[in-house]
């Protein structure tokens, strides 16, 4: 039960804060005027606007400025409008002309003789606004050029239909289960095979794009959310190949053991069903099992209600394959699996093997020995705060150190 608290202090603090003003038109987002002004004009512009708010006479200049910001903002937050303006340079020119016309009308209304200090602040805002309009205009040319370059580079590694700039694809990949939206991705990639991954990652690095791996998009940590417009979301949902439960030999065991191999885009429930058909239980059982994918389960070290008995993803992985931020292949194998929870083993040993982008040329290998107890926090169980996990790649990193492509459980 939560400790009781009085609301008087909280209400008093809330009343002292500046009100969340909503004067910018066409703003259907959760961003306040302050956040939009800072994004488009900079922090100094918001300070100036706040000073001038109490000195308005008719408010017409402020209204025209907010209309300029509203027009820019509604286009920036709507990929369909962006595509329309990219396809219609004449219409785009008319919009930019209208924005500059409003700023020119504000310029006409300046009265430097009445209050030089106030007029200087208005001039400062006009300079920032003109720069914002110019940047808005230039952004379309930059986007168009970058799209052509991206098409040329990415088509070497995947089919043209897998390179998606359309509004629907970008809108579908702007957020995850958090419903938190920051930026729309520049492009969405939907590769057909695991083999395409390393080449695509290398191409995205050449294009200077921030790479975001994505599976089912069911996460609640924001790991699949683009934070910059120059970002690419690599959707792994087409990587849905998997085996039935098969008995194979694994390192450290004389007798073969039952395992299942899956690609990163396989929905978790499909693996559970395969295990059940063979008379086994798949331990990884998040609430989102009907929609989440295996790659995300590994990146998050997913658990679920069955984890109490049989452990989380890390406890049950035999090996996994991933692409590093250097566009190399990395294969991680557990050498001495105890067929139980990893913290019960005195030492957990992993073999790391790096390969060239072709997937065949081995570049180096390394053995990583980690005390079993290092994976758990006393009295807590899985330590979600320990992202490093003694340097073990892929697991619990939320996609930050590479892109999971397949695994054996």
Give, region by region, the residue ranges found by the protein language model.
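N-terminal flexible segment immediately upstream of the FAD-binding catalytic core
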Residues: 2-202, 219-258, 287
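FAD-binding subdomain of flavoenzyme oxidoreductases
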Residues: 241-251, 261-409
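Residue-level detector of anion-binding/catalytic polar loops
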Residues: 209-210, 281
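Glycine-rich beta-strand-to-loop/alpha-helix junction loops that act as flexible
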Residues: 214-218
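Generic, well-ordered alpha-helical scaffold segments in large soluble proteins
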Residues: 153, 157, 200-203, 207, ...
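Short coil/turn segments at beta-strand junctions that form active-site/ligand-binding loops
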Residues: 207-209, 230
């Amino acid at each position: 039960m939560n400790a009781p608290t009085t609301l008087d202090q909280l209400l008093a603090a809330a009343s002292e804060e500046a009100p969340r003003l909503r004067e910018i038109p066409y703003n259907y987002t959760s961003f306040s005027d302050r956040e939009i002004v800072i994004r488009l004009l900079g922090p100094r512009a918001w300070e100036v606007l706040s000073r001038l708010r109490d000195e308005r006479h008719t408010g017409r200049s402020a209204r025209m400025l907010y209309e300029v910001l509203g027009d820019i903002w509604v286009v920036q937050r709507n990929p369909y409008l962006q595509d329309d303006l990219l396809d219609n340079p004449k219409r785009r020119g008319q919009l930019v002309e209208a924005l500059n016309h409003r700023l020119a009308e504000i310029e006409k209304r300046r009265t430097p003789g009445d209050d030089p200090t106030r007029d200087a602040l208005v001039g400062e805002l006009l300079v920032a606004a003109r720069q914002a309009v110019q940047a808005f205009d230039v952004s379309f040319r930059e986007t168009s050029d970058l799209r052509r370059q991206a098409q040329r580079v990415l088509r070497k590694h995947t089919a043209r239909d897998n390179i998606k700039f359309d509004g629907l694809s970008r809108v579908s990949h702007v957020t995850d289960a958090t419903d938190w939206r920051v930026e729309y991705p520049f492009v969405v990639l939907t590769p057909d095979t695991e083999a395409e991954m390393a080449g695509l990652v290398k191409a995205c690095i050449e294009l200077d794009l921030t790479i975001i791996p994505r599976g089912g998009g069911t996460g609640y940590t924001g790991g699949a959310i683009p934070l910059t417009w120059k970002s690419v979301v690599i959707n792994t949902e087409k990587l849905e190949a998997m085996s039935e439960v098969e008995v194979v030999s694994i390192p450290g065991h004389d007798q073969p053991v039952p395992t299942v191999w899956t690609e990163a885009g396989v929905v978790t429930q499909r693996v559970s069903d395969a295990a059940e058909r063979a008379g086994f239980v798949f331990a990884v059982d998040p609430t989102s099992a009907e929609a989440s994918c295996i790659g995300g389960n590994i990146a998050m070290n997913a658990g679920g209600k069955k984890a109490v008995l049989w452990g989380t993803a890390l406890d049950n992985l035999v090996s996994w394959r991933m692409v590093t931020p250097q566009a190399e292949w990395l294969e991680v194998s557990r050498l001495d699996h105890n067929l139980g929870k990893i913290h019960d083993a005195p030492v957990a040993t992993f073999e790391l093997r790096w390969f060239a982008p072709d997937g065949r040329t081995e570049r180096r290998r390394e053995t990583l020995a980690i005390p079993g107890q290092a994976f758990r926090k006393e009295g807590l169980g899985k330590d979600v705060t320990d992202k490093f996990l003694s340097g073990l790649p892929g697991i619990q990193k939320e996609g930050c150190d590479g892109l999971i492509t397949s695994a054996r459980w």
